[in-house]
Amino acid sequence: MWGYSESEEFALVPAPPAPAADAILPTLRLPSTPEKLVAVAALPGEARNNIFAWEQCRVLRTRLQQMLRERNLRTLLVTSTIAGEGKTLVAANLAMSFSQLEDRRVLLIDGDLRRPGLGAFFGHEARAGLSDCLSNGHKLADVLVHLHAHLDYLPTAAAFEHSVELLNRGRMRELIADCAAGYDLVVVDSAPLSPIADTQVLVRLVDAALLVVRAGAAPYPLVRQAAELLQPKLIGAVLNAVERGASQVYSNRYYYGPRPEDAK
């Protein structure tokens, strides 16, 4: 099984098997910006491509590293249009990849208060976490999990029903600011944009956002809406569960726009 091990090289957890290349989501131009939504990486969905997948994760890190440095961005939100597109795996592996850089301190936050998933990824069952910092007065230092020398993890202990109200409190803004001051990079795994509003609150508190899109998963109108909701913080997309041959093409020139049949 793919996952994190302190004694081994970090490994990317693959997404479910990919559909055919022609089933990749359509292209989409955003009305709010003349720029295309550029795919900063394309991750394969087949387990046999795990070496290639990890290389693509490093490609993602390299491209993001340049963007973050040039724009002085320290907090990055990772989300998706709907559940099941692989945003938690991308967030976790991205944080691990950045933490491999020399003298780079990284914090990974489980910001999906309704359906926290990072605990299962790391095999960690938290008794307290983000929601306790926001509602019960817990100190950040008391709930942080130290994964290795350069990577810390802020868990969410349990699903929280009234998450929007909790995230809207000023304490969340303060917590993000405190984390940005103490780490070189803060990666926030957030809830999917549809059908809840949590991420619309969180995206206002971070410097940048990354949209994970699983090939053939979310309907075109929802992906378009998700991209628009993340503006102006959206800096790119990660294509997940793409066939290896297709990913070599789409990682360089993929963008969103209507299918030819949509124009009929």
Residues covered by each model-derived region:
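Long, basic/Gly/Ser/Thr-rich N-terminal segments
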Residues: 1-37
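Hydrophobic micro-sites
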Residues: 2-14, 224-264
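Pre-Walker A (Motif I) flank of P-loop NTPase domains
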Residues: 72-76
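Conserved beta-strand segments of the P-loop GTPase G domain that flank and frequently precede/overlap
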Residues: 77-79, 155-156, 188-189, 211-214, ...
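Hydrophobic positions on the alpha1 helix immediately C-terminal to the Walker A/P-loop
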Residues: 90, 94
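Conserved Switch II/interswitch segment of TRAFAC-class P-loop GTPases
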Residues: 193-195, 206-223
